[in-house]
């Protein structure tokens, strides 16, 4: 969704993401999609003739559902976004439970800590992921430019989980 801009007009596109909101007005449905790659989502516009319209009509596509939408990017006539997806097909990849806890409102950090598996779907979780990605990329790029070689070292853990391993001593001192 991050790359959706007016330069992509024309030709078919396919996007996948989580449903942030669903609105129905005058025989047209608007589905806002998000995938964490940008702060804003992408609005998909579906007409009653669109494949998958029944999924909206019977309420199976709701906030939190994962979907695949095919269509064409067009200039948005409404304010608030530069482009929208004129959808030709909507496919439900994963339904959301009726008691899906994330809604449009802002949630406290404590609320999100209790639902860590849903944190990446929030604006905050997506922003943190994008910042971490940019920082990791910049760090690697800097050190690569300075002639360093990246090495992924093995991890040494201090815990013996359920007796599955054998403990041993690690020291930085050289034996005499």
Language-model regions: role of each:
Residues 1-176:
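Class II aminoacyl-tRNA synthetase catalytic cores and aaRS-like
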């Amino acid at each position: 969704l991050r790359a959706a801009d007016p330069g992509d007009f024309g030709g078919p596109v396919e996007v996948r993401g989580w449903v942030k909101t669903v609105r129905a007005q005058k025989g047209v449905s608007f589905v806002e999609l998000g995938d964490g790659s940008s702060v804003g989502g992408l609005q998909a516009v579906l007409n009653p003739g669109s494949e998958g319209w029944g999924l909206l009509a019977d309420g199976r596509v709701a906030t939190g559902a994962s979907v695949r939408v095919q269509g064409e990017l067009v200039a948005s006539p409404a304010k608030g976004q530069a482009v929208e997806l004129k959808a030709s097909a909507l496919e439900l990849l994963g339904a959301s439970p009726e008691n899906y806890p994330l809604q449009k409102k802002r949630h406290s950090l404590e609320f999100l800590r209790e639902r860590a598996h849903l944190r990446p779907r929030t604006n905050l979780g997506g922003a943190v992921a994008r910042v971490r990605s940019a920082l990791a990329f910049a760090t690697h790029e800097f050190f690569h430019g300075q002639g360093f070689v990246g090495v992924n070292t093995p991890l040494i853990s201090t815990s013996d989980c359920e007796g599955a391993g054998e403990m041993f001593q690690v020291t930085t001192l050289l034996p005499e």
